[in-house]
Amino acid sequence: LALTLSDEKTLITHAENAAKFLGYEIFVRKSNDTKRSKYGVLRRVFNKRIQLALGKDTFKKKLLEYRVLEIKIHNGKEYWKAKSRPKLSNNNDFEILDRYNKEIKGIYNYYCLANNCSSLSKLGYIMKYSMYKTFAQKYRTTMSQIRKKYTKNGLFSVRYYLKNGTTKDLTFYHGGFKKKN
């Protein structure tokens, strides 16, 4: 192909070490776990499989970018705490909830191929409590009062009106963070 490679951008990594690409960590799994085949023979089916993983730093950066995460260090250990987004307080309830839903779904749709994408549930938790705090700040009340006011059938939802006068409810994302194939 006669391609020229840039020394700054090119990084050759051993397959067992994770290579970071587009927010994913790509590596070859090294595992001695066995599974029986349909003929009853033990096989190492998980060994030498290419894995896509989601690093903790990846969604930590995203949460910091959205300004919903406050990191506190106590006794050398990192604690994550959700914080409100004052810039969204001027929006109506539908716009606030819709923004949070779009951000969560966007991140999940991008990282749903990762083998450990269920770790995004921590991101969902932080985003949910950030949303509670944003609503509480907007109405100058507590998170528990906001949850009581907006929770219907166990789901956080906001009622909004359409142009023809009918009402609909927009619920907070509750689709889970399962790996997609």
Identify the residue ranges that each predicted region occupies.
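Non-catalytic terminal/accessory segments
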Residues: 1-181
